[in-house]
């Protein structure tokens, strides 16, 4: 099993609301608290976001209609993806899906044996092209949102600062993945990111400079392969399907 890099100590939020009973028709394999709490950017009143993946019963894939691939709930906010869908998202380096297997230990709420196996193969999902396309793509989306905000309105100004913080986070995570091969979910200096968010909300041109600087660093040789290695994910999914296969009862003679 791959040795997990040591993460800074992270305390889970005080008395988070309990997760509801499992809603998808399957078994949750891995689930944890993500978003601003994981990044270290949460503040009083911040939502607590949960992300996880589940295995639908294997027989559910044998009929005309495949099982639902995602289940989203509110109060609390939780998104669960079926195992195969999560793998497809992670192989494209989707930032939200990817962070699930890089969380600090204390933020996991469900971590079964197959979830542990997935964490052990997390590096195989990464690729230089995927990180560049996904992380820069999402950061650029945040930048475009900044340009359309009316910062004279206090609520819009607060949203602009939030978009700016996400932009900074995405760029820092992209560069760290490219240069170190490790997803920096927990930001080492959240206060600096908050301050940058406020600065960018007032001057979006600074975000453009950050985007350009990150792009330059991502253009340099890094430690990630050009393409992800799909073989570990494929083998893991076979184990998931085997573990959740229940043979149909024999027909009566």
Describe the function of each predicted region.
Residues 7-11, 15, 19:
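Long, intrinsically disordered low-complexity tandem-repeat segments
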Residues 93-97, 174, 181, 221, ...:
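Short secondary-structure junctions and interdomain/linker hinges
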Residues 2-4, 20-109:
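An N-terminal structural lobe/cap that precedes and organizes the functional/catalytic core
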Residues 1-7, 45, 248-252:
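A broadly tuned "polar low-complexity/structure-edge" signature
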Residues 8, 24, 159-162:
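Short, surface-exposed loop and linker segments with low hydrophobicity and enrichment for Pro/Ser/Thr
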